[in-house]
Regions:
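N-terminal charged helix/coil linker that caps or initiates catalytic domains
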Residues: 1-26
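Glycine-rich phosphate/adenylate-binding loop
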Residues: 2, 109-114, 121-126, 136, ...
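Conserved N-terminal Rossmann-fold NAD(P)-binding element of oxidoreductases
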Residues: 27-29, 52
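Hydrophobic/small residue at the entry helix of a nucleotide-binding pocket
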Residues: 33-34
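Conserved S-adenosyl-L-methionine
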Residues: 42-48, 136
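Glycine-rich phosphate-binding loop and adjoining beta1-alpha1-beta2 segment
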Residues: 51-89
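Conserved SAM/SAH-binding loop
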Residues: 98-106
């Protein structure tokens, strides 16, 4: 009998689809990268999704974030994601946490309940906390490095953090992870040199912020889809 996942089942098989439907995956960061990861996970039949993001949808998100439309501006990103997931798969269980995951909030959550964890947040402190807690709980984790100021989606690849080059965020993460005794981590990263955004300093100064990275609809989205694809392949084995 046909179902909404019939075409995926043709590739993965019924046993793998059952595993995906029983799986519980946490996604940290539901922005340009994480939003597309969530989309692909939902469309692949993941049964339970836990979403973590403290931010709300804003006008400047529309150029790259799948959850951002003029109708969702002002909504919590996790709430917008929950609505979208249920529109895709009404049977999915979605737990939405509008929190900023960091050392001071980490104790609220038990990572051992997850089958896989995706790190798609921007801050080094938060990323390190997620990765350390995932490893401590013996839960597979995959992390996304920088996607801002890039135009070439074909430069994205999946590798171990120890093999990354060029990406400044990956360099910082390698150093900080080594300090914590972590030498291996599956990541999505780009070999493209970061471009210099035009007029970014002026815009940042006007907003009273640090330099704002440029972004596109396709590089963060491609990274998110790669994250989800790796999770689906691993969970369906």
């Amino acid at each position: 009998m046909q179902s909404q996942f019939s075409r995926t089942e043709l590739l993965l098989g019924s046993s793998a689809m059952e595993r995906l439907q029983k799986a519980r995956v946490a996604v940290f960061g539901i922005g340009g990268v994480g939003g597309y990861a969530v989309e692909a996970l939902a469309r692949s039949g993941i049964g339970t999704l836990d979403l973590f993001d403290h931010d709300t949808v804003s006008l400047t998100n529309i150029n790259r974030q799948i959850l951002a439309t003029h109708e969702t501006i002002g909504m919590k990103k996790v709430d917008a994601a929950k609505c979208r997931i249920h529109a895709i798969n009404p049977k999915a269980v979605v737990n939405a946490y509008p929190v900023f995951y960091a050392p001071d909030t980490a104790d609220q959550f038990d990572f051992s309940v997850y089958d896989y964890i995706i790190d798609a947040i921007d801050t080094v402190t938060g990323k390190l906390c997620i990765i350390q807690n995932a490893i401590a709980a013996n839960v597979p984790v995959i992390s996304c490095m920088g996607t801002g100021n890039k135009l070439d989606a074909s430069a994205l690849q999946i590798t171990d953090i120890s093999k990354t080059t060029i990406c400044p965020l990956a360099r910082i993460m390698r150093k900080e992870l080594r300090k914590r005794g972590i030498n291996r981590l599956k990541v999505v990263y780009s070999t493209e040199e970061a471009l210099t955004p035009v007029g970014a300093e002026e815009e940042a100064a006007a907003l009273g912020k640090r330099t704002i990275p440029g972004s596109t609809a396709f590089v963060p989205g491609a990274a998110g889809l790669m994250l989800a694809g790796e999770v689906i392949r691993d969970l369906s084995k």
